[in-house]
Amino acid sequence: KSEADIILLDVEDSVLPASNKQIARDTIKKNIESGLFKDYDVFVRINDRESGFLLQDVTQLCIDGIDGFLFSKTNTEEDIFFFDKLLEVIEYERGFEIGKFKIIPILETAASVINADSIAKASSRNVAIGFGSEDFVSDLEGIRDFEEAQSLFMPRAWVAMVARTNKLIP
């Protein structure tokens, strides 16, 4: 038995080539339905709005046993507002309680870090905020120096402060 806070499953960047994404979704559904993770909160990192996979991810993975989603590449509060409403429609159509599925926005660009406070406030479904350092450094066209990571101190601290002031988990 694990002492993990949550189980995080992934259908985003770690699933390549893209033709494997359906296999990943099917595997997640099979493992959830088998009860493998029944004692845990389960979140799935899904593909972003512009990927072409978001709708498939959400419609197939809004099932009992999934508690929420990591919403990749969140840039603005509109991204979260859109995703919140998408979840609401699915919950309504499937007879789930509205608000069942939680959101963890992942901030991976300079714009998203600047917009962190409005993103945090965009939905009552938000339970935490994540910071994606690899994509953040790419967005800045920076040098990856994760050993010292001095260039990441400010955005990490900012995201943590925004999370705490909005009563979210950093």
List PLM regions with ranges.
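Expand to "…catalyze enediolate/carbanion chemistry for C-C bond making/breaking, isomerization
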Residues: 1-170
